[in-house]
Amino acid sequence: VAEIEIGIGKSGRRGYSLDEVAISPSRRTRDADEVETSWQIDAYQFEIPVIAAPLDGVSSPATAIEMGRLGGAAAVHAEGLWCRYEDPTDVLAEIAELTTQRVSGQSGETEQIERMRQIYSAVVQPDLIARRVAQIRDGGATVCIAVTPASTESLLAHIVRAEPDLLVIHGTVTSAEHLTDGAHEPLDLKHLVRRLEVPVLVGGCASYQAALHLMRT
């Protein structure tokens, strides 16, 4: 992909969303029976190479169980609504309605953002983390719990105590080395991975080089 000049000494490459990408067959095709899609993380085997994103609009305990039945996995976020509310069904329905109202012009974006902040201001409950892990495990699926880098240290003890199978460190943009002015202590991924027995996945990197850097930790 050609690089584009974006400033003095700086360049970048055009990024594409999934909606803009089409997969076309090559000149040589292969019978489906001869294709192997299974993969493995530590001792955990999956039939399809898919882990559903740890977003409240994507992954729930029920989604994780169903994904496990289909051969994949789904990461439930320890800071999501499922670990803040006993039953977030009504809250999720309200969020969907807020989106509908904004699209139709019935409410503004400012009001929607403010209500979302109120909804997510509910405190994460450690007992709910343990219950979601147990719920997914009882459903027969591999338990995958996600947490943001900023909250990893504060929630780690509760997550480890719940005994998930996989831990995902998930951020909008995640790197192996974070520079700060010292006001906030950054998460040391290398140290974290080495002191945990649970396999750790890190998500939120947008390039091949960033992925390699993370894997070297």
Predicted regions and their residues:
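Active-site entrance/lid segments in N-terminal catalytic domains of soluble metabolic enzymes
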Residues: V1-T217
